[in-house]
Amino acid sequence: MIKKYRKTKETEISVELEICGSGNAEIDTGIGFFDHMLESFTKHSLIDLKLICKGDLNVDFHHSVEDCGIVLGSALREAIYPIKKIERFGDSVVVMDEAAFSCALDLSNRAFLVFEGPKVGKVGEFDIELLEEFFRAVAFNAGITLHLIKLRGQNLHHLSEAAFKSFAVALRRALSKNERAEIPSTKGIL
């Protein structure tokens, strides 16, 4: 179990994470739609996650969403590295009605993000541009090379959920045990 805590003038966040979990979630960010996305992530990654965030929501959701990505990414980094006996690479395509999202990732300990998804609009009060901010914060703090690409769809709720679920499934696959892959790199270290 990895525990992380971060407090700034804008947010206070605590995370408890178990990557070998069963998808249990206890999420409270004060942002209902974001909570729903994080619950979808835990369910489909099979990671147990407790994430509590108190943020300056009266200003904007940006600080809370990005900072949750920072702390979650930091917890993932601690849980994942050093890598031994796992697949390392993962990919998935997830559909939700008319929406389809693709995710490919590498637990490379090298941070990179390609995000080709919706950037304008809202789901309720949630600015859709925050999706990219969240995934960037996760990727850069976890040391993940992450490619998330919209394949089709218009409904912003469906697209968002497909993106989170696709990331979850790809991460679950990358974390899958592979007893033959002592260190899955020709460098001998990740």
From Swiss-Prot:
The entry assigns this protein to a family as follows:
Belongs to the imidazoleglycerol-phosphate dehydratase family.
Q: Name one GO molecular function term.
A: imidazoleglycerol-phosphate dehydratase activity
Give the source species.
Answer: Campylobacter hominis (strain ATCC BAA-381 / DSM 21671 / CCUG 45161 / LMG 19568 / NCTC 13146 / CH001A)
UniProt keywords (A-Z) are: Amino-acid biosynthesis, Cytoplasm, Histidine biosynthesis, Lyase
Which cellular component terms (GO) are annotated to the entry?
cytoplasm
Name this polypeptide is given: Imidazoleglycerol-phosphate dehydratase
EC top class, as a word: lyase
> Which pathway does the record list?
Amino-acid biosynthesis; L-histidine biosynthesis; L-histidine from 5-phospho-alpha-D-ribose 1-diphosphate: step 6/9
